[in-house]
C-alpha cells in the first residue's frame, strides 16, 4: 500500500458505530461494467442486475444493518447503509457517535467489512458467470450522515443520479 495515499476515512472514527453512511463504490478505472444510461434511466446489464440484487440482499448477511436508497450506475454504486445499534441505545437513528475504534476500521460489522463482503460477492459472481475482466477500485468513498436534512439530500441525490449522469464526476 502506498503510504502517501490520501486518507479518505475520518481519523479515529468508529465505522462500526450505529448510524447512517453514504457510500460510493466504483469499478476499476471507472469502466462501465453495470450497464448504461439511456433517456435519463439506468439500464442494467447482467452484472448490473447482480449488483442490484446483491445490494438488496446485503442486510440478510449482517444482523445489525439495513440499506436505504441506492442506485447502480454504469461504473459505480451509490447507497446508504444503516448500522443499527447492537444494544438498546437511546437517540436518533441517523446521528452517528464519534467514539473511537482502537482496533482499526476493518472489524466485523464495520462499514469497511460490509463493503468488502459486497464487493467480494459481486467479484465471485462475475468470475462464475464468465465476466473475468470485472474489477473494483480498491477503496470506496463514504460520508457519515449526521442529520435528517443530510439524509434527505443524499436520498434525493441518489434518486436523481441517472438524470444528472452527463454532469456526474464519475461519468467517463
Please identify what each model-predicted range represents.
Residues 1-172:
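Short catalytic/metal-binding and nucleic-acid-binding patches
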